[in-house]
A protein has these predicted regions:
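A short, aliphatic-rich alpha-helical micro-motif
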Residues: 1, 135-136
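Positively charged, low-complexity intrinsically disordered leader regions
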Residues: 1-23
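Short hydrophobic segments within beta-strands
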Residues: 9, 63-65, 104
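Short acidic, glycine/serine/threonine-rich loops at helix termini
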Residues: 14-22, 71-76, 99-103, 115
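Substrate-binding N-lobe of the ribokinase-like
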Residues: 27, 32-99
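Conserved phosphate-binding/catalytic loop of the ribokinase/pfkB sugar-kinase fold
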Residues: 89-95, 102-135
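Short acidic, glycine-rich surface-loop motifs adjacent to enzyme active sites
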Residues: 138-143
Length: 143
């Protein structure tokens, strides 16, 4: 059987998990005080789709826009380690690479903190041109 070639186009981001426990309420405000025990980072958004496709044995290419920051480098490092092909990942210095941080205490999500750019992307024509050059190399395209 031949390997499926999938092209994933979408928002790459980091999912950051902060795991801890809570045994008291803050005296400053009625909120839980979380004692951090562990932290982990993995691909989120379209990156989660990429990771799942790779785990199923597909060959995966990626088209996306990231910020020009350390988080983008972390996303690219994880993609490389997983074996994804960087077809077209544009670094935009005006954008923040998205990070979704979730604080977990006693197996419950306490809060999610989003750090991201929500403005429309400015490099649409570059993405469309890049897509036009490579889409025929893939069996399936996921948006």
């Amino acid at each position: 059987m031949t390997q499926v070639k999938a092209l994933v186009i979408g928002d790459l981001m980091l999912d950051h998990y902060i795991w801890g426990s809570c045994d008291r309420i803050s005296p400053e405000a009625p909120v839980q005080v979380i004692k951090i025990q562990n932290e982990s980072v993995c691909l989120g958004g379209a990156g989660n789709v990429v990771a799942n496709l790779l785990s199923l044995g597909a060959s995966v290419g990626v088209i996306s826009v990231l910020g020009d920051d350390k988080e983008a480098a972390q996303v690219e490092q994880i993609l490389n380690e997983l074996g994804a092909k960087n077809e077209l990942i544009i670094k935009d210095h005006t954008r923040q690479t998205s990070i979704k941080s979730r604080v977990m205490a006693t197996h419950q999500q306490v809060v999610r903190i989003d750090k991201e750019s929500i403005e429309s992307i400015e490099c649409e024509s570059e993405l469309i041109a890049g897509f036009g050059k490579i889409y025929k190399n893939y069996d399936v395209i996921l948006l």
